[in-house]
């Protein structure tokens, strides 16, 4: 029971961190797009106007993205034995997404921006998220596609309680929007982009919020069971001590 409570605590805390991270990255990205308010032209034009503040969303992502693995692991541990196959699928997809996203964020944070700060522009255009045709932008899109696809498998993993049913509905909608997300990777279209924005910036944080509530409820139930078992042991030991006196 104690192990289960610890798992739910980790899952609950990890969901909260993911929510804060995803919302922070989204807000900062939107703010930077409004501040810059210009389309990508070339690396020389970008170099004249670039600011180190632009890398903040990627710094946050680089630090916090691995937390999704804690959430996936907590989901796996909370499942019944016959449902744990889907938990493994979620962990696999989360691991793939984490590796890809960490690579994309690392390229800009640890390679591109230090080069720009040193006055080197050659070769950096493919390592900047500001360039819509860069390698890191493609990796980021692929990473979030895999991440949202992986968490859409919670539809198969969870049970039939009211909270779990709501989570499953969010998961299946997110899975459907992933088709638009996938098309957005290959085709630059406003409708497809809307699907990716809804999936990553709205439904994924919402799913994390509901999963956090799910872990919180599990944690409360588990603590009540622990307390009940402890009370039963106290009564049992008291009874044994009482009869031992005779």
Predicted regions and their residues:
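Hydrophobic, aromatic-enriched alpha-helical segments typical of multi-pass transmembrane helices
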Residues: 1-237, 241-245
């Amino acid at each position: 029971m104690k192990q289960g409570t610890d798992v739910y605590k980790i899952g609950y805390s990890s969901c909260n961190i993911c929510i804060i991270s995803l919302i922070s990255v989204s807000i900062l990205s939107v703010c930077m797009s409004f501040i810059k308010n210009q389309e990508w032209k070339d690396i020389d034009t970008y170099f004249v106007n670039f600011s180190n503040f632009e890398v903040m969303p990627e710094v946050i992502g680089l630090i916090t993205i691995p937390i999704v693995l804690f959430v996936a692991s907590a989901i796996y541990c909370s499942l019944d034995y016959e449902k744990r196959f889907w938990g493994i699928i979620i962990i696999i997809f989360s691991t793939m997404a984490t590796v890809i996203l960490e690579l994309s964020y690392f390229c800009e944070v640890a390679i591109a921006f230090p080069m720009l700060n040193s006055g080197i522009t050659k070769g950096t255009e493919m390592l900047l998220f500001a360039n819509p045709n860069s390698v890191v932008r493609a990796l980021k899109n692929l990473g979030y596609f895999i991440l949202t696809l992986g968490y859409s498998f919670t539809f198969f993993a969870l049970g039939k309680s009211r909270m779990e049913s709501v989570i499953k509905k969010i998961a299946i909608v997110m899975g459907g929007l992933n088709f638009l997300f996938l098309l957005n990777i290959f085709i630059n279209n406003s409708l497809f982009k809307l699907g990716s924005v809804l999936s990553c910036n709205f439904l994924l944080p919402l799913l994390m919020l509901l999963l956090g509530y799910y872990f919180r409820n599990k944690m409360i139930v588990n603590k009540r069971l622990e307390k009940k078992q402890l009370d039963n042991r106290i009564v049992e030991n008291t009874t044994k001590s009482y009869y031992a006196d005779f």
